[in-house]
């Protein structure tokens, strides 16, 4: 859905807009630093690289040091597709060294980071001295709020099922379930049963 939405938006996006006697022109932000997490690696990488390319930005990608292969393969694919040298750049390494160097580098104009809140704070602090834009998707593990009029069996068992998707490694897994106090005991039994029947 990310790519379909991006492609659809690009078809009608107004790069220039006349407002009275003024012309508003939207231009690429410049070099984008992209730091991606270990879970859903090719999806996370693509969701940062595709919009940057579409906007006309060059980029430096640092994939997670524990899941670097997808970034390497994408670099090979982009090279084979004829993306000019220097448009897509790949660096491997850890956050404290490579991530910090990217975030603080004066020639990187925007940082896009997906990962932990702890690391996000470090990215924002490192980027502050150069006053670059910072876009972050932090933390994860979403709340699953079940209201009084919900079908409790369906909501709880469905929520438990979603927790185990992608081996439980999804940042949007609804792992914090909030139910009405009066339904707590019943919800707990449904959750136990659903978890016990989950298939690896």
State the predicted function of each range.
Residues 110, 118-200:
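ALDH superfamily catalytic-core signature
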Residues 22, 89-112:
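A structured beta-alpha segment of the ubiquitous adenosine-cofactor-binding alpha/beta core
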Residues 1-49, 83, 88:
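N-terminal Rossmann NAD(P)-binding subdomain characteristic of aldehyde/semialdehyde dehydrogenases
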Residues 9, 35, 94, 114, ...:
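Conserved residues at the C-terminal ends of beta-strands
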Residues 71-80, 95-106, 118-129, 145-149:
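Active-site pre-lysine segment of PLP-dependent enzymes
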Residues 45-99:
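PLP-dependent aminotransferase-like
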Residues 61, 90-92, 113-115, 134-138:
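General beta-strand structural signal in soluble alpha/beta enzymes
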